């Protein structure tokens, strides 16, 4: 590359121009660029000690978070859920324990992510906020630690896979390889009986055993206790327990006290 060409590029950067935009009709910067600071170039030149230094723009982190959130398969509404939106005032101790455990897990994540006990499970009473808390954890990991998370709602996820087997291999591979896998409502019971066909068990074992062997974290919610998970499948249940035992809360008690959907019923 010639010296003249380098000077031309630097001149374009100083003026916030991009050659591909040179022939376009004049537009306001606000309509042309997502980021007015760097003109969507990811950085800009600043003068330091008489030299022009390329500085990364803060919008790069924002774009990364946006990509992570989009790839997570967490719905737009659930991406808004955080710890600040979770109410513990007046709640039973089990709910407060789940809240504190989940926040502690996020705080500890970087130190434990490669360990055997690097996962979290919130189990028990439906409607107690398990999904909210683990979604808040997933959102926090993506937004502050830039950790890729994949969300898999057990019932809906397997319904989609059953309806399109062409997706199966690619989806299971994503679930195995994700930095963090969030499994929501594992084996959700129907009329008190865990929902777990032989085919579902085979797929879940394949995913969870891979993650177990490779020390890959999971976020797990289920209405079943550890004993219930073990009864469904001992090999699977014991692996989940070993992975999650340091960050495990089982929420038990009266439904009217624990299920937020029943507030005000009596």
UniProtKB/Swiss-Prot annotation:
Pfam family for this entry, one: IstB_IS21
Residues spanning the signal sequence: none
One MF annotation (Gene Ontology) recorded for this entry: ATP binding
Keyword ATP-binding included in the entry's annotation: yes
Binding site for ATP: 124-131
InterPro entries: AAA+_ATPase, IstB_ATP-bd, P-loop_NTPase
One GO term (biological process): DNA replication
Keywords of this entry: ATP-binding, Nucleotide-binding
Similarity comment text for this entry: To B.subtilis YqaM.
Role of this protein: May function as a transcriptional antiterminator.
Name under which the protein is recorded: Phage-like element PBSX protein XkdC
Native source species: Bacillus subtilis (strain 168)
Gene expressing this chain: xkdC
């Amino acid at each position: 590359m010639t010296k003249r060409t380098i000077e031309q590029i630097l001149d374009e950067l100083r003026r916030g121009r991009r050659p591909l935009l040179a022939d376009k009709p004049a537009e306001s910067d606000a309509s042309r660029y997502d980021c007015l600071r760097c003109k969507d170039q990811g950085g800009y030149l600043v003068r330091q000690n008489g030299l022009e230094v390329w500085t990364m723009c803060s919008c790069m982190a924002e774009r990364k978070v946006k990509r992570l959130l989009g790839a997570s398969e967490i719905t737009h509404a659930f991406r808004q859920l955080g710890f600040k939106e979770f109410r513990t005032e007046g709640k039973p101790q089990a709910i407060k324990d789940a809240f504190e455990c989940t926040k502690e897990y996020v705080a500890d994540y970087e130190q434990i992510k490669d360990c055997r006990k690097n996962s979290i499970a919130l189990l028990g009473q439906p409607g107690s906020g398990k999904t909210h808390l683990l979604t808040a954890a997933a959102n926090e990991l993506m937004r502050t630690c830039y950790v890729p998370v994949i969300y898999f709602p057990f019932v809906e996820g397997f319904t989609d896979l059953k309806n399109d087997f062409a997706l199966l291999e690619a989806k299971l591979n994503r679930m195995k390889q994700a930095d963090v896998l969030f499994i929501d409502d594992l084996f959700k019971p129907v009329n008190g009986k865990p929902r777990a066909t032989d085919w579902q068990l085979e797929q879940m074992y394949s995913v969870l055993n891979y993650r177990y062997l490779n020390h890959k974290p999971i976020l797990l919610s289920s209405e079943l206790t550890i004993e219930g998970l073990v009864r469904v499948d001992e090999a699977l249940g014991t692996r989940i327990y070993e992975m999650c035992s340091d960050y495990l809360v089982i929420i038990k008690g009266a439904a009217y006290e624990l299920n937020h959907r029943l507030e005000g019923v009596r």
